[in-house]
């Protein structure tokens, strides 16, 4: 039996398939900052419907999502506890300190 491994710990581990590359090359695109990208607009509409929210925002990376989350939930001097293998500890550098004024404390997970 062939083992299939799916790596989800970081968006840097994924590679697009030939079909994905074809879809990207053929996609109708526009200026997302001006609300003119039909793919992003469709994604935002789907997200609003799925989660029952009145609006949505497109964030292009997991790092951006994590940093915004910490800025919203932490005050300067707060400490964020995370598993010692967490992306915010191992890969994102001092983003929490720079943007949220918070420190990351890695702990042993289970």
Please name every model-derived segment.
Residues 16-62, 84-90, 95:
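Conserved N-terminal alpha-helix of the aminotransferase class I/II PLP-enzyme fold
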Residues 65:
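Binding-interface segments
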């Amino acid at each position: 039996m062939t083992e299939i491994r799916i790596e989800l710990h970081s968006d840097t581990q994924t590679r697009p398939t030939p079909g994905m590359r074809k879809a990207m090359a053929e996609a109708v695109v526009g200026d997302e900052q001006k609300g003119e990208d039909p793919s992003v607009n469709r994604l935002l509409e789907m997200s609003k419907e799925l989660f029952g929210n009145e609006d949505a925002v497109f964030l292009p990376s997991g790092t951006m999502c994590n940093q915004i989350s910490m800025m919203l939930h932490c005050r300067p001097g707060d400490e964020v506890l995370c598993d010692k293998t967490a992306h915010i500890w191992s890969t994102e550098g001092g983003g929490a300190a720079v943007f949220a004024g918070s420190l990351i404390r890695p702990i042993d997970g289970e």
